Amino acid sequence: MEQILKYLQEAHPKPDPLLLELEDHGRRDGIPVVSRETGRLLSTIVHAMQATRILEIGTAYGYSTLWMALAQPRIGRIWTIDPDIRRTEIALSYFRRAEEDDFIEVFNTPALELLENFTHRNLDVVFIDANKAEYRAYLDLAVPMLKLSGLVIVDDCLSDLDAMRSFNEYFLNHPDLDATILPLGNGTGIGARKR
């Protein structure tokens, strides 16, 4: 599998230089970022859907945010949530350098607290990559915010099977989603809202 991943990384064009810099920054600071493959998947989905209304739960340094922002139409909007102001200040510096800061709104508050009062609906994409213990609650609050056929994408579904097993079963059997989990990165769940 390592050989296949190496081949794919070499076959793809190099990501935007800011993304490479951000990968390195996260690695140096010990801040986890999604895999490059997951970033490419997010970018491809956002581009294919021409997604203009995206909610991200878990910003960190903004690596996944930037993958989506660079693929999004210039009329789009990303709302991203992370209570850690120090990390989101770093993210904002990269958004400014990429000239994407006008299209991204950062909320420094606990995600569940914000989601309970979040007024935006008909979202194209919701990306979840935050506190794993709260994944189910995030999902329950986020699915009704999606437009019909909108996507919820979940990172780290296979990172710790014992910890994620219950959530994964809930996600795959969610009555409002047509969902699957791909062995991409640390496991990427994708669910389309069907009702």
Segments (PLM) and residue ranges:
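A short alpha-helical cap/connector motif
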Residues: 1-125, 132-153, 157-195
